[in-house]
């Protein structure tokens, strides 16, 4: 099936919405040979590898771990400033949301304006779907349970 048809047939994603597909459902829709971009390993197009390295370096610097920076062929101050601004947030949940938003926006860089139904659009969708699935897995109830477990262990 042509890539433009696949890209056009995908359900829309919303940053704060529910994921329209499970990860396995999404993979079953992809063309043979599709390399799933991965924010952890940097697998994907050369463009994604470069953006991913810049974001990881910016996060490492914001956490004070410059020694963990990777070699990047360029340095985009836009991403550094976005990550730095996210780390200014005191509330950990809001900070994580801002960082997720940076990753979301960075994934959008893979879709060329001149070709919105291209292979890059599939990469963007894959990365954004991972973000939505991660965000869907976070709940206040689970967070409170973990907090209670940690604080009860500390009180003993």
Outline where the language-model segments fall.
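Extended alpha-helical surfaces
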Residues: 1-156
């Amino acid at each position: 099936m042509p890539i433009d048809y696949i890209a056009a047939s995908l359900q829309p994603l919303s940053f704060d919405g529910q994921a329209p597909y499970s990860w396995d459902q999404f993979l079953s829709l992809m063309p043979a040979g599709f390399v799933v971009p991965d924010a952890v390993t940097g697998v994907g197009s050369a463009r994604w590898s470069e953006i991913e390295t810049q974001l990881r370096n910016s996060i490492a610097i914001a956490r004070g771990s410059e020694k963990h920076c990777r070699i990047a062929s360029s340095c985009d101050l836009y991403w550094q400033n976005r990550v730095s601004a996210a780390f200014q947030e005191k509330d950990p949940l809001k900070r994580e949301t801002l960082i997720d938003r940076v990753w979301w926006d960075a994934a959008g860089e893979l879709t060329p304006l001149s070709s919105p139904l291209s292979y890059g659009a599939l990469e963007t969708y894959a990365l954004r779907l991972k973000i939505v699935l991660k965000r869907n897995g976070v709940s206040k109830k689970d967070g409170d349970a973990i907090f209670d477990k940690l604080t009860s262990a500390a009180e003993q």
